């Protein structure tokens, strides 16, 4: 299987680079939940460790606590990562602060992570809004608090993206903060249906599944000015496939392994990219 991906990458490189090798290909590698197969996902320890190992772009997830604080967690329950079956959205910040992950790390909150990033050489952070069960009133509070917490602390030159599977969250964020950069996430591959949804939302960033995404679909998306993030990225081979398909962003659970592999074996690739909309 690995040989297939080597061939894919080499073929794409040869086909695209009849000019000198200086025409480096670019793809932004981001650490999914900090790089969840390499670190204690979505804890401060995860981001510190991956940053110290060269990662400069991230995805993370957030939910609203019972006292309207923003907590960093993918699952509503802490059972999988902390070993306790409690609902983060039904507890206060003070109550959540009592828990330690299975690896001994405390619950992380958005203001703490934003502060950590504030003086770092961060290129890109995707703040994924977990909001499917929120009322319109909660959504407004959630989006406004998120924007006002992270944007004042954004490092100069960094790109902060507000993303969600919940299109209501995207529309609410844009209503409250028209300058916000938003991304729609879907479990579908890049396809006409997804491109139509982006047009409906008036958003030009999308996170799609790498499975069943084709080069033709990627070409069509890029012709429409869409920036594409392909996921999941469970291994180095998934990164190679994302690159071969022409992704702008590869969302990876093993970002350090990907960066090291690319440095040693895919020297024509720059693992960062200007992701501003043109």
Predicted regions and their residues:
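Sec-dependent N-terminal signal peptides
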Residues: 4-13
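Phosphate-group recognition and catalysis centered on beta-loop-alpha active-site segments
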Residues: 16-278
């Amino acid at each position: 299987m690995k040989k297939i991906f080597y061939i894919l990458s080499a073929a794409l490189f040869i086909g695209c680079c009849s000019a000198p090798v200086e025409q480096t290909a670019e793809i932004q590698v981001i650490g999914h939940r900090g790089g969840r197969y390499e670190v204690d996902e979505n804890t401060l320890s995860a981001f510190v460790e991956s940053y110290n190992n060269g990662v400069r772009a991230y995805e993370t997830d957030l939910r609203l606590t019972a006292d309207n604080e923003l907590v960093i967690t993918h699952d509503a329950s802490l059972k999988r990562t902390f070993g306790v079956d409690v609902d983060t959205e039904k507890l206060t910040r003070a109550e959540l602060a009592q828990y330690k992950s299975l690896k001994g790390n405390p619950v992380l909150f958005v203001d703490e992570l934003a502060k950590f990033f504030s003086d770092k050489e961060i290129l890109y952070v995707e703040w994924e809004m977990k909001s499917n069960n929120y009322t319109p009133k909660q959504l407004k509070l959630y989006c406004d608090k998120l924007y006002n917490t992270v944007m004042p602390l954004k490092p100069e030159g960094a790109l902060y993206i507000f993303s969600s599977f919940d299109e209501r969250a995207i529309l609410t964020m844009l209503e409250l903060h028209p300058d916000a950069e938003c991304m729609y996430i879907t479990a579908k591959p890049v396809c006409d249906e997804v491109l139509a949804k982006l047009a409906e939302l008036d958003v030009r960033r999308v996170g799609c599944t790498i499975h069943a995404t084709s080069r033709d679909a990627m070409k069509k998306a890029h012709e429409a000015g869409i920036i594409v993030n392909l996921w999941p990225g469970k291994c180095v081979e998934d990164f190679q496939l994302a690159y071969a398909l022409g992704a702008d962003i590869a969302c990876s659970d093993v970002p350090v392994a990907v960066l090291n592999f690319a440095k040693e074996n895919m020297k024509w690739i720059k693992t960062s990219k200007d992701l501003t909309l043109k």
